[in-house]
Amino acid sequence: MNHQATDGFFFQHKSAIIKYMIRFGTGGFRGVIGQSFTKENVKKIAQALANVYHQENAKKPICVGYDFRSLSLESSVWISEVLLGNAIPVLLSKEPTPTPTIMEESKRFGNEFGVMITASHNPFNFNGVKIFEKDGMDAEKPLTDRLEKEISSLSGIKECSLEEGKRKGLLKENYPLEDYLNNILSFVHIKKKTPQTKILLDPIYGTGTLTLKKILTSMGFTNINEIHGGRDVKFGGLLPNPTKDNMEKDRAFFLKGKYDIAIGTDSDCDRIAVLDEKGEYVDANEILGALYYYLIAYRGMKGDIVKNIASSDLLDALAHKLGYVCHQVDVGFKNISAAMKEYDALLGGEGSGGLTMRGYIFGKDSTFATALFLEMVANLGKPVSKIIEESNKFAHFDKIVVEDSLSFENTGRPVYW
């Protein structure tokens, strides 16, 4: 049987591959590499997007980016070639980036659409395609439904090489990270310089290794160490998600090094996790709650907060005590972003570690969240545990954790990611 090897993966020849349906979930299209995530399917998604682009009479370039995963770079080229073949201008990143970088770029240029190649926090053998709408917002269901319908009725795929796209003036390539980081810095207001704060970073071999240390250094922090940095398409055997289990694996190293705070991020750097100065895991709801309290009580900002149904009532209690409203939406960060626009909310986030702020991008971003959290730590001059304690105490909130598990019968029906 014929096989192709890429980054240590072995894929069966296309004649042996089952035809998988392309379905978009709350985080875009995701699939196992060599099964549903194939060159053929990636190009189908690009052609469907091209069709919708022309149906909407869109005019601006489509920003295309990619992360560290296997086939991400190649897929960004496949996407671009199809868009160029449909006479659509493309702004293609020349460097791997976090997902929020392409969202920020799309928003900054006011683009109608954007594309990011990533499977976010999924295991190493997955990859995916995220589509962004106007101003860099995650694609909503009406758009993804249209894309699925277009895919099911495609009669062919138009393509154009990158070289030809350049000759036609349709393709521009750039390095978006610098502008992205400068935009984050415009939201940061540090009054107290605390370069001695000892910070441990764990990007879990994801694109956070490109941004976290840079942003903190620009903010004046100098005592920074990173573990699990650089690119490893298998993420060192770890699930590339800063879960409590993953963060607690860093605890011994953290305590031995006498760090003040640890920050963990997922593979495309849109989720954040924190260890306090005792090496204790800080719940994502408490991160969001502390930041909301800080922005209103200490920075004098105003506004409601948005959470999803999987988030804690801590946020409701805080909002009530502060004189604002906590709005609850369904799972999916695009629902949080939509509600933030509707209510002009100050902050929005979810219990899995994603958050954003009014005026910033319409999507979660852990580089931004890291900068905001370390601003809070610096300005308040308190250990992380005391900051969390203060916001919880203000809300009269106590946390009781009860762990349980569920099991499901294997029906043999396919599951789409």
State what each model feature region is.
Residues I18-A87, E112-F113, K166-K198:
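An N-terminal, well-structured beta->alpha segment
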Residues N127-L255:
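Gly/Ser/Thr-enriched, mixed-charge loops and adjacent short helices
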Residues F9-F11, Y20:
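Aromatic (phenylalanine/tyrosine) cluster motif
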Residues K94, K149-N182, E277-G351, T356:
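Proline/glycine-rich low-complexity loops and linkers
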Residues G27, V64, I102, V115, ...:
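Buried hydrophobic positions in well-ordered alpha/beta secondary-structure cores of metabolic enzymes
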Residues M1-H3, G8:
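Targeting/processing segments of secretory and organellar proteins
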Residues I261, M301-W417:
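Phosphate-binding and adjacent anionic-ligand microenvironments
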Residues N51, P61-N127, I215-L275:
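N-terminal small/polar loop signature for handling phosphorylated ligands or for N-terminal nucleophile
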